[in-house]
């Protein structure tokens, strides 16, 4: 079964048609807003986007993969580059906590993490996403290495995992109202541990 014909939009097979992909993501955002995570389904997205389920599954192998793309599209976070690692990481976490707290993205991401505990497709989608995030946060560490702030032998990905674990714990325990001072203290402890002697 192919995509239902929609004027001005056509399927181009396995390669994503940008117009169709946007329509599907917009439909997914709308279904998520109306039905929440528990009421979200590929069937509902397909109906709303007037697209075939096979098209959606060809482009996103699981519900979780589509939801992660929706999450990424909604995520509008500045990545600080102040010239000081402690400021960059603290600013990143403050912005992330506010984004999770003040938008539906926090609930979506929390639900994805929970689903990944029992669903292999969700776990795989989350692992792929985390790999990209690890590299993104790791780039802040690498910049600090270049500036001589951080010891050359520090593994940037491990430090990124430490920062992510702090953030995820607050997300999963619904403690996103953490005081900025506490966030800065946690970051200071991490940075002291990797600082160049």
Feature-to-residue mapping (PLM):
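C-terminal peripheral helix-coil segments that are non-catalytic and often amphipathic
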Residues: 1-9, 91, 95, 135, ...
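Basic, helix-initiating cap at the start of DNA-binding domains
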Residues: 1-39, 43-48, 54, 65
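Hydrophobic alpha-helical connector segments
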Residues: 77-109, 159
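Short amphipathic alpha-helical segment with a characteristic S/N-K-E followed by hydrophobic residues
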Residues: 24, 39, 62-67, 76-78, ...
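Amphipathic alpha-helical packing segments from all-alpha helical-bundle domains
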Residues: 107, 120-146, 181
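Hydrophobic alpha-helical segments that form the core
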Residues: 151-173, 182-192
């Amino acid at each position: 079964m192919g995509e239902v014909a929609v004027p001005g939009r056509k399927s181009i097979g396995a390669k994503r048609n940008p117009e169709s992909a946007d329509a599907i993501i917009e439909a997914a955002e709308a279904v998520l807003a109306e039905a929440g995570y528990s009421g979200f389904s590929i069937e509902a997205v397909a109906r709303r986007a007037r697209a075939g389920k096979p098209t959606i599954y060809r482009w996103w192998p699981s519900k979780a993969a589509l939801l992660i793309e929706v999450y990424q599209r909604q995520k509008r976070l500045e990545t600080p580059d102040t010239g000081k690692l402690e400021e960059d990481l603290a600013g990143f976490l403050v912005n992330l906590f506010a984004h999770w707290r003040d938008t539906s993205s926090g609930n979506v991401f929390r639900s994805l993490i929970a689903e990944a505990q029992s669903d292999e497709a969700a776990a795989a989608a989350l692992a792929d996403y985390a790999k990209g995030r690890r590299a993104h946060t790791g780039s802040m560490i690498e910049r600090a290495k270049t500036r001589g702030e951080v010891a050359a032998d520090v593994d940037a990905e491990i430090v990124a995992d430490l920062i992510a674990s702090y953030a995820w714990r607050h997300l999963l325990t619904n403690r996103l109202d953490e005081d900025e001072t506490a966030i800065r203290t946690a970051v200071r402890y991490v940075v002291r541990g990797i600082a160049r002697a």
